[in-house]
């Protein structure tokens, strides 16, 4: 299929149908040549990153919106506008290929309209680009409800967060300590002419100067290295697992944190729990590549009686389901798929899982509550409420008035993440 047509289909699936980019994009990639996968990804990610700007330009250039069965052609126009405004593709190729996309989408009669819209944008680009950032939606390219949360929670930092969310994320690696230490792997990258830098705190983390195909990484197939953001790798620092312990990684998919524990310590057993059977397959695949063993269980964290093996855990990593507002730079569709009411519903779910997991923790054991969110309701307020109702919970490493650690997007080039460490008093 024509790459621009495939991109329009992805935008339609995400924006109009509410499907996630991580579902829609791989499906679309199956319809195009492998060599075009990166181009498709760049167009889809970029168009979703700057969606309100593209929408406002399209609105200016069209007499009436395309509706119903023609909506996919509206998204094809956005694909064309993104290429012309944000990519280095020659204008004639961007326009020509986008117009041809209408043919691939079985809308040959709309080719003239699409061509005219894109040509008019070329003629009036400067004025239209200025117009597209003249309102808050276009200037910050965040939904108003999320912008308000950020402004209220981070009065000094919200613009930094917005900017980080709108930039491309770097590629972080986690070196498998069972094979090499970080300095050794750094040398392997150097030998392969792959530029990289270290992280000051995440002891196995390496940041690549430019993203690359994983198969070009030394020893990827042999399990020497994995792709994982440095902020997620800090879960090991906070959990501090020890040899011989019984450890639970709750809401474990896709398994990066489970693997990190297994790479670093000889636990008696690590249990990887998740309620999503499809995503658990990723856990199994990742562990297989890394030649690691864990007990993988499909179950609801709120109902341990369905899966619990009868012995309390020494340590629990609760990577709670969340709004994922800390990883927008990796998943720009989150901005348009989430709603304000989702935060309240997620906070309730987190609270239920928190209580259920606490009951599975041994006296003297450690629970790390983690999210990849940056909303206070899911993080600081969640932990405060838990401490208020749980007398045996002792907060470690932070103050009760401001519990845990909030990492904001872009901080040492990390994703947004939250961690709070709690010990169960014996």
UniProtKB/Swiss-Prot annotation:
Which enzyme class? transferase
User: PROSITE patterns under this entry?
Assistant: NOL1_NOP2_SUN, SAM_MT_RSMB_NOP
Give any Gene Ontology cellular component.
cytosol
Q: Catalytic residues?
A: 372 (nucleophile)
Q: Name one GO molecular function term.
A: RNA binding
The entry's localization annotation reads:
Cytoplasm
Q: Where are the transmembrane segments?
A: none
What does the record give as EC number?
2.1.1.176
Which reactions fall under this protein's catalytic activity?
Answer: cytidine(967) in 16S rRNA + S-adenosyl-L-methionine = 5-methylcytidine(967) in 16S rRNA + S-adenosyl-L-homocysteine + H(+)
Matching PANTHER family: NOL1_NOP2_SUN FAMILY PROTEIN _ ANTITERMINATION NUSB DOMAIN-CONTAINING PROTEIN (PTHR22807:SF61), NOP2 YEAST -RELATED NOL1/NOP2/FMU SUN DOMAIN-CONTAINING (PTHR22807)
What is the protein's given name?
Answer: Ribosomal RNA small subunit methyltransferase B
Identify the species of origin. Vibrio vulnificus (strain CMCP6)
